[in-house]
Amino acid sequence: MKILLHTCCAPCLIYPYAQMSKKGVKASGFFYNPNIYPNQEYQFRRQALIALSGKQNIDIIYAEYNPREYFTAIQNKESSPERCAICWSIRLKRTASAAKENGFDMFTTTLLVSPYQDQDTIKEIGNKIAREEKIGFYYEDFRPGFKTAYAQAKQDGLYCQQYCGCMYSNEAWIYRTK
């Protein structure tokens, strides 16, 4: 089975990729994250993913970085609780499309490793997109491996971000650290 794995960052890829490999799944990453802000943060995450994929021989598809796609999608919802669901949805929809275009059997996301993301909503969105796009959504609760993955990333000298990615989560992180 071949699965395209939406990848938000290198640390979050470590555990899901290892778990799927143990099960005999051929997983490839898909780095599509128009939400990441600012551009410098995007580049840090992209470079960390390049380093990890080179070290572990992981195939990654890098989509174009276009933050306008994110801001258009969340327009008038910037301070709404719906903002995160919209963000997950645009990334999973693009991943499903890329999976179909590139001959994958299913798609999934590294967002499922984070204890900070709404697992149920992501699963619901993934299943909805799977029905619409007529491709399977692979669900697994990867959260048990979150701490181990981040420890491994730090040990390997990979960049580990302090916030989800968007400018709103960045502002919230800055506020919390004051």
Regions found by a protein language model. Give the residues of each.
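Nucleotide-activated chemistry modules centered on ATP-dependent adenylation/adenylyltransferase
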Residues: 1-178
